[in-house]
């Protein structure tokens, strides 16, 4: 399986989630299963079956996160010398050439993407157009609504 890029913040968030799942939810679910067992007949015990189902979902999420972390190539963009070039992990200010509207995006891994939070996937059309370009460059982004031209205003390593 190939490694996929992830920011330091993305890896930290996944590690915190695993810690919460293992340290808080897992013990709570085990307790709920134990309490449901005490109620008697397990065949028709809705509380028991609900707790077991929740346990399965939590364990699956733990396995999923651990697999992602083991296959992640964590990239600390702050450790890379600033060159004005757009690379994975950089935060980029771009201006729409037509409307002069400026937006800021951080280029992150697929699992970290959150457009409302200003984080776009490295595989998104905007990120693919920006990667490798430098401050001052004009880029053409192909979108479903048509081509949009942007100018790279600033590239930051934060």
From Swiss-Prot:
GO terms for biological process: DNA-templated transcription elongation; regulation of DNA-templated transcription elongation. One of its GO terms (molecular function) is RNA polymerase binding. The keyword Aminoacyl-tRNA synthetase does not apply. The keyword Oxidoreductase does not apply. InterPro entries: GreA/GreB_C_sf, TF_GreA/GreB_CS, Tscrpt_elong_fac_GreA, Tscrpt_elong_fac_GreA/B, Tscrpt_elong_fac_GreA/B_C, Tscrpt_elong_fac_GreA/B_fam, Tscrpt_elong_fac_GreA/B_N, Tscrpt_elong_fac_GreA/B_N_sf. Necessary for efficient RNA polymerase transcription elongation past template-encoded arresting sites. The arresting sites in DNA have the property of trapping a certain fraction of elongating RNA polymerases that pass through, resulting in locked ternary complexes. Cleavage of the nascent transcript by cleavage factors such as GreA or GreB allows the resumption of elongation from the new 3'terminus. GreA releases sequences of 2 to 3 nucleotides. HAMAP family: GreA_GreB (MF_00105). This is Transcription elongation factor GreA. It comes from Pseudomonas aeruginosa (strain ATCC 15692 / DSM 22644 / CIP 104116 / JCM 14847 / LMG 12228 / 1C / PRS 101 / PAO1). The gene is greA.
């Amino acid at each position: 399986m190939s490694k996929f890029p992830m920011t330091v913040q993305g890896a930290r968030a996944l590690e915190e989630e695993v810690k919460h799942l293992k340290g808080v939810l897992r013990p709570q679910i085990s307790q709920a299963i134990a309490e449901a067992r005490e109620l008697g007949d397990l065949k028709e015990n809705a509380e028991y079956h609900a707790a077991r189902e929740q346990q399965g979902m939590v364990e699956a999420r733990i396995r999923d996160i651990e697999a992602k972390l083991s296959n992640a190539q964590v990239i600390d963009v702050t450790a890379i010398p600033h060159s004005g070039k757009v690379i994975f992990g950089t935060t980029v200010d771009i201006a729409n050439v037509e409307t002069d509207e400026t937006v800021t995006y951080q280029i992150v891994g697929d699992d970290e993407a959150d457009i409302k939070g200003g984080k776009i996937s490295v595989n998104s059309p905007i990120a693919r157009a920006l990667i490798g370009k430098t401050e001052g460059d004009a880029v053409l982004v192909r979108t479903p609504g048509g081509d949009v031209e942007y100018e790279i205003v600033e590239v930051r390593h934060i």
